[in-house]
Amino acid sequence: MILSITFQLDPISNNSTSLSNSIDNRSSINVTALQMQQGSKTYNLDQNSSYKTVFLAICQLFGIKESSAQDYCLQLESSKKYLNWPPQSDESKTKHIVKQLYESGETALVLQLNPTYRSSKWVKALNDSETNEKDIMFHLKYKLQENEFAESFIEQNGMEGILRMVTNGKGNAQTYSLASLRACLEYVSAMEIITKTPHLVKQLFSLVDSNVVGVCRGALELLFVLCDFRKEEGFKSVHLAAKGTAVAQGKKPYLNVIKLLDSGDLETKINAFTLLNVLLSNCPTDEKVGKLCKKWGELGLDDKLRSLTSIQQQEFQIQLEIYEETSGVNLRTKASRLEAICNRLKSKLTEYEAQQPLIAILKEELKLAQQLIKEASTDRVFLSSHPMQRYLGPTIQSYPADLSFLKTTAAERDKINEFEKKILAINEQLRQETKLSEELKNQVLANKKQFDSTIAELNEENQRLTQVEVKFKLQQSISPSQDSSNNQKASSSSSNTSTLNDSDIQSIQSSLKEATLEIERLKLAIEEKMPPNEAQQIFSQSLITTAAFTPTSPDISNDGQPISGGGAPPPSPSPPPPISGGGAPPPPPPPPPPPSGGGAPPPPPPPPPSGGKKAGAPGAPPTGPAAIQPNKPVINPSSKMKPLYWKRIILPPSNRNESIWDQVLEPTFDSKDFENLFCAKKKAVDSSLSTNPSSTTGKEGEKVKLVSLVDIKKSNSIAFMLAKIPTAEGLKKAIDTVDNSILGKEIIKTLITNVPTEQDYQLIKGSEIHESKLDKPERWILEIYGFPMMKERLVAWLFQLEYQEMYNNIIQILEKLQNAIKDTKSSDSLKKILGIVLVLGNYMNGGSGRGQADGFTLEILDSLATSKDVENKTSLLDYVSKISMEKYPKTMNVAQELDSLKLVQLSISDMSTDINDLEKQFNISKNNCKKVLEANIPSSSKFQSTIGSFLEKTEIDIKNLKENQKNIVDSFIQLVEFFGYPKSYATTASCQQFFNSIYSFSLLFSKQCQKIEKEREALAKASGDNGAVQNKKIAGGADPLAALANAIKLGQTGLRKRPGPENSSGGSQLNLNK
């Protein structure tokens, strides 16, 4: 095949000295004047050649060396499509280019500098002070219409040079620069870069103050398009630019924009007003909206707008309506607003009627094309091409002579489908492996906790044995002497006993050391994340036995028999309990398949036993009185369908409250496709995974060598506490003055558990040991004992320190529940999804007692993912997600809309328990404070004034808290009734289970929708032309920015309405425009 190649250089202005198209510049890229005059050249293409070979050969035709060939690329002359862009050096990825070129029949090619090289020269020209700025900007606007060039230009920070020329330029140079900036901002990448570069947005915002009307008007348009396209990020960028400009000028933010409403140019007024509306629409919070409206009202915005309500321009009237709804400010009377809406609808109706003749012609053309396709699909020898001939000329300039490539394309498409199926199978296997690894990780964490508890018990036993040893030796040292004959015999017996006790204790300590080392080895295996089979082998080789930890009393001999009256040794520790595998009981078995000879359908499976029901799971409301009959028609599928075991809800025709089932939409769907997928057939049962128990590790405790007369645990606790508290006198003073800087919450908790008791005091006094020989805990008890009302004051003080945290926790729990109730009731996406499930379920249950349902209970949502089609591949959840993505694409984000539901962690009874516990501690502290007051302690005046005022305020808070809880509980009961449940169920329902059921379904639904979306994107990417740059523009059409700006002015981009009572009844009519 003979190719015709034309060499083309970038047509840059001849007036630009740095980018002149002189002979000298052309020679620098190895192109002589003679070669430029020769025009195009021809090349004989061999379809077996590689692309690299063909490309280098073409470059040599024009005298371009191989070292400089990387700066060039080939382009189809007809479609302006690059053959290898972005450039691929791997020949395996470019070998198809020659084949496609040969099969397409394209013979005209263009050789030119690649987009990256050309864009770098333009960026350099912008930064060159000697260039002719006006000519550069005039030509740059047209160069930016090429997608590949524009993307490279934006990536090399070319917009910064354009903005500098817009700011500093004058006259036509400034106008051309603004037009080039508009051409850049048509691309998504430019929007992202300028949003993340605050000084660029600030430069753009400063153009609002320009004296040139066109520059000011264009800057306003770019600002509101940027803000609307980038949403919250755009708002933050523009808002910071407005504040920065105002600080630099010493004025208030947005004053310059509001003053433009007095401009004599109507388009400038509309652009300024639109910018303000877009800023309000993209505010992150309603509170911010209110603050902005208040500040703008103080600057005179509302008064200006009231004076401009007579402007009849359509864009201005629409912006007025948007501002009234967003800000809640009534600028016109209700009659005026309705009249404006009516006029706009009349104009739209007139426009619609004018389009009807054209629509009728297009319908006829469509029927003709469909008939031609139908005829072409049949086996015919002759087919008339005249009906479609007029469409082929304008769209296709040249026709391929050989159509054999269609067979190759079909074969490649089949291979792609096979690869996609394999990829899906691999992804499913990866998901199962990830799930298994998570379960094994949870097992390791649980076993590690069990190890730690075992070691804690071993340490405690070690301390007890050591204490027994010390006490025994002390008793031996202070025992009274006897007569000489008895003394000798007793001495011999004592020596044997002492030796026996020392050896036993050494044996115990040795066993403990060996056990600790073994446990450390097992703990190391867990921390190293060994595979389960190796870890299990290590656990089975563990040397830890119960015999190694059997404590030996000082009164037990070597053969295990008690010496005197001793009790039996303590039992060995019991094995650790198995890990509980919570979860619901298994679902009931599916019904048996129908008999081969037909007949009546099998009965539904028996209901689960009462004991196997999940606690708090939504129960089934009664189906209604016998007098209530279904309102929906009976559905009789052509094939026997798999049943969907829901519990239907039949709404009474009258005398009832509003229900969510009155608001759901039941969309249409392909019943034949649905029947093919979900007709009656057996389905497979998944197997569950098993868990393996394991062990834990710990550290060997240290020996306690001090002698203590009080309980060992209390003695140790006091010893640790003494290092953190002041002396006894300082402690008494801190309690009298309620000094939080000396005693913190944790220290007060320890003090309460270690307050000296009468028993401790008498034990120390009765020992008749001198105070100098007592340990620190015993001496502290003697010093602090007798301090009046110590425990009562500490308990009240601790409640004061813990109260705010407890109160805030309860408030947060109530707020989470309140938000969950609000989001669930107001979610439009949830209503649409439930409508799809309802219509599919009624179809599946057609002709049975479960059909003709007005609604269903929510527990059926959990089984949608497990209800498979006849081939056990597609689940009912997949089918629901597919229909939802086709009809309501925005429902994909339902999990984000219901994100507050996952925060509900407690039931209503748990919240009541928390409030009752708070009230109980309050009453205890109140009684303790009363006891301190009645005791008339001279040094407790500060305590009474501090704690007394705190308790008075707390009593009011708890009362308000209980009222708030009652209101939220009533709201939850109303929500449960809103979903069709009876009031008897609503009073006993668990809000945690109720919301978790909805949220878990929405999460699965959103994940499935995202999977569908990714598959569509991958398919679209795979079906696109190889090497083509994606046209990532902000909108379609010849001028995307102007199209998006016009849509924003007409309110067609979904500017939000501020919810609240200020929205008038005409809000629903306003939606007709959007």
UniProtKB/Swiss-Prot annotation:
Biased amino acid composition, Polar residues: 549-561, 1062-1074
Gene3D superfamilies in the cross-refs: Formin, FH2 domain, Leucine-rich Repeat Variant
Stretch list, region Disordered: 476-507, 549-639, 1053-1074
GO molecular function: actin filament binding; profilin binding
Limits of the DAD domain: 1037-1073
Domain GBD/FH3: from-to ranges: 34-423
Coiled coil: 502-530, 914-971
Annotated ranges, domain FH2: 631-1031
Residue span(s) of domain FH1: 597-623
A Pfam family annotated for this UniProt entry: FH3_FHOD1-3
Pro residues composition bias: residue spans: 568-610
A GO cellular component annotation in the UniProt record: macropinocytic cup cytoskeleton
Entry text on domains: DRFs are regulated by intramolecular GBD-DAD binding where Rho-GTP activates the DRFs by disrupting the GBD-DAD interaction. The DAD domain regulates activation via by an autoinhibitory interaction with the GBD/FH3 domain. This autoinhibition is released upon competitive binding of an activated GTPase. The release of DAD allows the FH2 domain to then nucleate and elongate nonbranched actin filaments.
Similarity-based family: Belongs to the formin homology family. Diaphanous subfamily.
Record-given protein name: Formin-G
Species whose genome carries this gene: Dictyostelium discoideum
